[in-house]
From Swiss-Prot:
The keyword Transcription regulation applies. InterPro entries: bHLH_dom, HES_HEY, HLH_DNA-bd_sf, Orange_dom. GO terms for biological process: circadian regulation of gene expression; circadian rhythm; negative regulation of DNA-templated transcription; negative regulation of myotube differentiation; negative regulation of transcription by competitive promoter binding; negative regulation of transcription by RNA polymerase II; nervous system development; regulation of neurogenesis. This is Class E basic helix-loop-helix protein 41. Keywords: Biological rhythms, DNA-binding, Isopeptide bond, Nucleus, Repressor, Transcription, Transcription regulation, Ubl conjugation. It comes from Rattus norvegicus (Rat). CDD domains: bHLH-O_DEC2.
Length: 410
C-alpha cells in the first residue's frame, strides 16, 4: 500500500537560526489598537467634534428663529431694536406662563360646570372678560390688515403707537374704577384711628363733639390741636352735646412748657370748644360754623361750663378780663346770628352787635389783627402762643372796651 502512494517529500524543519536576519514586514497587515489611538486620535477626533457642535448650534438657532416667528406681535413690540436670542427666550417663557394660567382657569371652569356649581366669577366679570377677549381679537385683526394692505411694519413708530394705545385702553377696561373724590383706603383708616383712640379719649378728655349737619359741606376745624379737627371728622357736623355727669374725676395730664413761665393748654381743655353757628338758629347754608376755644373767652362767658372743669386749674388757662381783654368779632356772622349770640352771652353783646351807624356794613371785609389791633392791648408773650387766632379785632369795639373800668389794663 505504501508502494502505490508516491512518497511525499519530507518537510524540512526550520530552526530558529534560519530566521535570523530576515524581514517579515509584509506579514503584518494592521497595527494594534493601542498604537492606533496613540498616533491618529488627535486628527480623527477633532473633525467629528466640530461637526457635532456646529449641528447643535444650528439646531438651537433654528428653534429660536421659529419661536420668534410664533411670538405674538404685541410681545415683539415691547422691545425696540433687534430681538436677541435671550430676549426671544424670555418672551416665549412669559407667553407660555400666560397661556398656562389661562388654560388652568378654563379647566377650573369646566370642572365647576361639570359638578353643577355656579360660575366662579360674577356675570359682570364674565362679560368683562369676554369683551376683553374680543377686544384683543379685533386689535390683532387690525394689525394684520395694516400689515397686509397698508404695508405697515412692526418697526414703524405709528404701528408701535397704535399697539401701545390699544393695550392702554384694554388695561383701563380691566382695572376697576376708583372714585376720584375719596381713596379706597381712606375711610377704613379713619375709622380704625377713631376706634383705637376711643378708649383714651373717654379716659382723659371731655365728651366728643358730635356733628350732624347734612346741609353743609364737611370742612376742617379752625383749631386742629384739639384732637377733634382734621380728616377724621370730615363726614360729621353738629353742635357739641355734653351729657350730664361729672367727668372732672377723669385724670388730666398737664404739659409743662420748657421755660416754666406759663403752663401750656391741656388737650382736654383745647378739645372743649364753644360751637357757635353749628346748628339752628345759627345754621346758614353759605356761612361755615366756627369754633372758639375756652381760653379766648373771659371767665364770665364760660361760666356755664365751669362745673365740668377743674376749679384749681381754671385760672391757669383762662385769661382774666383785666389782664388781657380779647375783643371778639367774627365778620362773617349774619345779623340774626350775632343778635342770638349776644343774647346767649351778655358779656359779648358789645362786641357782637354792630354799631348803629354801620349796621349795613356789619358783614364787611375782615381786618387783620396785626393791622388794627390797638397799641395798648396786651398779648401773651410766650414762645408757644397762638398766632392763628380765629377772630379779627375791631378797633371801635376795642376802644369801647377800654373805657370800661373792669377791663382797664394794669
Amino acid at each position: 500500500m505504501d508502494e502505490g502512494i508516491p512518497h511525499l517529500q519530507e518537510r524540512q524543519l526550520l530552526e530558529h537560526r534560519d530566521f535570523i536576519g530576515l524581514d517579515y514586514s509584509s506579514l503584518y497587515m494592521c497595527k494594534p489598537k493601542r498604537s492606533l489611538k496613540r498616533d491618529d486620535t488627535k486628527d480623527t477626533y477633532k473633525l467629528p467634534h466640530r461637526l457635532i457642535e456646529k449641528k447643535r448650534r444650528d439646531r438651537i438657532n433654528e428653534c429660536i428663529a421659529q419661536l420668534k416667528d410664533l411670538l405674538p406681535e404685541h410681545l415683539k413690540l415691547t422691545t425696540l431694536g433687534h430681538l436677541e436670542k435671550a430676549v426671544v427666550l424670555e418672551l416665549t417663557l412669559k407667553h407660555l406662563k400666560a397661556l398656562t394660567a389661562l388654560t388652568e382657569q378654563q379647566h377650573q371652569k369646566i370642572i365647576a360646570l361639570q359638578n353643577g356649581e355656579r360660575s366662579l366669577k360674577s356675570p359682570v366679570q364674565a362679560d368683562l372678560d369676554a369683551f376683553h377677549s374680543g377686544f384683543q381679537t379685533c386689535a390683532k385683526e387690525v394689525l394684520q390688515y395694516l400689515a397686509r394692505f397698508e404695508s405697515w411694519t412692526p418697526r414703524e413708530p405709528r404701528c408701535a403707537q397704535l399697539v401701545s394705545h390699544l393695550h392702554a385702553v384694554a388695561t383701563q377696561l380691566l382695572t376697576p374704577q376708583v372714585t376720584p373724590g375719596r381713596g379706597p383706603g381712606r375711610a377704613p383708616c379713619s375709622a380704625g384711628a377713631a376706634a383705637a383712640s376711643g378708649s383714651e379719649r373717654v379716659a382723659r378728655c371731655v365728651p366728643v363733639i358730635q356733628r350732624t349737619q347734612p346741609g353743609t359741606e364737611p370742612e376742617h376745624d379752625t383749631d386742629t390741636d384739639s384732637g377733634y379737627g382734621g380728616e377724621a371728622e370730615q363726614g360729621r357736623a353738629a353742635v357739641k352735646q355734653e351729657p350730664p355727669g361729672d367727668p372732672s374725676a377723669a385724670p388730666k395730664r398737664l404739659k409743662l412748657e420748657a421755660r416754666g413761665a406759663l403752663l401750656g393748654p391741656e388737650p382736654a381743655l383745647l378739645g372743649s370748644l364753644v360751637a357757635l353757628g353749628g346748628g339752628a338758629p345759627f345754621a346758614q347754608p353759605a356761612a361755615a360754623p366756627f369754633c372758639l376755644p375756652f381760653y379766648l373767652l373771659s371767665p364770665s362767658a364760660a361760666a356755664y361750663v365751669q362745673p365740668w372743669l377743674d376749679k384749681s386749674g381754671l385760672d391757669k388757662y383762662l385769661y382774666p378780663a383785666a389782664a388781657a381783654p380779647f375783643p371778639l368779632l367774627y365778620p362773617g356772622i349774619p345779623a340774626a346770628a350775632a343778635a342770638a349770640a349776644a343774647a346767649a352771652f351778655p358779656c359779648l353783646s358789645s362786641v357782637l352787635s354792630p354799631p348803629p351807624e354801620k349796621a349795613g356794613s356789619a358783614a364787611g371785609a375782615p381786618f387783620l389783627a396785626h393791622e388794627v389791633a390797638p397799641p395798648g392791648s396786651l398779648r401773651p408773650q410766650h414762645a408757644h402762643s397762638r398766632t392763628h387766632l380765629p377772630h379779627a379785632v375791631n378797633p371801635e369795639s376795642s376802644q369801647e372796651d377800654a373805657t370800661q373800668p373792669a377791663k382797664d389794663a394794669p
